[in-house]
Amino acid sequence: MLQGPFRVPSFNGYIPRRLQPWIYLLFAFIFLMSGGIYGGAMSQVMGEYSLMREDVLMIIMFNVVGVAMPFPFLFKMKFHFTNRQLLLNAALVVATCNFLIMWTDSVPLMCILAYIAGFFKLCGTFECMSTIQLWMTSKRDFTIFFPLLYCIVLGNMFLSPWVTEHLIYIYQDWRIINWAMTGALLLVAFIVYVTTHDFRFMKPLPFISIDYLGCTLWSAWMLEFIFFFTYGEHYNWLDSKIMQMDVLLFIFTGYFCIQRMLHIRHPYIEPAAWKYKRLVPLLILFAFVEFMGSTPKVLQTAFTGGVLHFGAITTNVLNFVEWVGALAGCLFCLFWCKVLCQKYTRLLTIGVATMVCYPVMMYFLINPGLNIEALYLPCFLRSFGNAIFFCMLTVYLEELMPFQHFFMGLTMAGIIRNGPMSAMCSGLYSFGLRYQMADNMSRGLPYDATNLLMLSIRNLYGITCLIGIAVLIIFLLWDVQPVRSTLKKMPSWNFVGKRMKKKKGFAK
């Protein structure tokens, strides 16, 4: 056993041991900040390339889907390549995608580059965080690891648009964030190249039994679903032949995904991974989180832009508030589990309650003379509850599934939360807002367009309140129990590698 401070084995000896895990934490932060087209640059990209809002959203969704897909491959890559090789390749690939996407106006090419960037940024993030997991929790405790992990993951989700919009405001060019992230990723690659060496803790496993076609099919299935709800309003839903064709493709792709899963030896997602008793309720909870989280994307944006007439820089402060809320929620999970020593499942009720506070407060706050400061508390509470749900549902998923299926489970959860549910809820809210506006105008109400919009937004917030309160009542009446009385520990990488070697038949 190593004595003294935690050490990353791949670092050269002249790097101080106390500094090594912090360097990897910085690498993970940079990987998570990176992307293809950044949400904060949406309006500038639309204006320069004459793209529709739906086009830019679809490019961003390709990046989000790309993040969800590498999970079943991660350990196969970890046990075949070295830490140095993985980080160098991930940093250079994501940097290349960030650079190339600035110089093309082809939406399909932008989508492909965004998907590749999302795929490899998750690979780089995983390699960084898995390397320093013993520094984060020497006892291999998931109730410590996941809250700390989501401090970075969810923190970047809200911090990235805040940084992007400020940089664009200062330099008046949407490409500045791509240049900044390309430079940061090249710096990561340079530091890794100079300060690390190839290190293996076990003999490499053959890089075989990789279901690339399965990954492609599941990705296409998710993206066809997202396409339907992203472009639904633009093409008038099923009245368009494009939407009808998309539905047919979605059905056929889903059929091929299932048939391939059932009939090959090493599928992308194993059939056994779908058979756990509590998996479906867990995926429904992930869907509920995405439903509650999609309200700001349509209703809050319509309210702040169409009623309050706030600009992007004014509303950008809400991203910072949500970042603070995400950090507070993750740290509260840590406090609840390790200081108060309470059951992690009880936190789900607190998470539901704080998330429901958001639409309830917004319902009563909607006013044409509202100050931006009045939105701080509801946005904070929504982000706080969202962080609790992400942390605790991931812990519950890890407790539910054995380790060999856990990373497949993360992709299954990603099928729900990484794009599809968000796109569906945003599309339905957009349809509901248009329907409410048309309905209110047809009634001949004595209001101008702004007041009709405000009334429509309040009605949709009211419907969201009712759904959220109904779910909260279910949680109050139904005491969700942990999967087991004692939490599992993270297995060591040597143990995982030996299990994989035995499963694939590489050992005698």
Question: Residue spans of the language-model regions?
Answer:
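Helix-loop-helix hairpins in multi-pass membrane proteins, especially solute transporters
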Residues: L74-L213
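A membrane-interface helix-boundary motif in multi-pass transporters
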Residues: Y169-T182, Y231-K241, S430-G468
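Transmembrane-helix exit segments and adjacent C-terminal regions of multi-pass membrane proteins
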Residues: L2-G4, P9-G13, P446-K508
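Hydrophobic transmembrane-helix bundles of small-molecule transporters
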Residues: Y169-I284
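Interfacial helix-cap and linker-helix signal at transmembrane-aqueous boundaries
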Residues: V45-G47, M77-F79, M110, W162-Q172, ...
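Short hydrophobic/small-residue motifs within alpha-helical transmembrane segments
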Residues: N63-V65, L154-G155, W323-V324, G419-P420
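Extracytoplasmic
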Residues: L2-R7, I15-L74, G124-T125, M129, ...
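12-transmembrane solute porter fold
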Residues: R18-S34, G39-G40, C97, Y268-Q436, ...
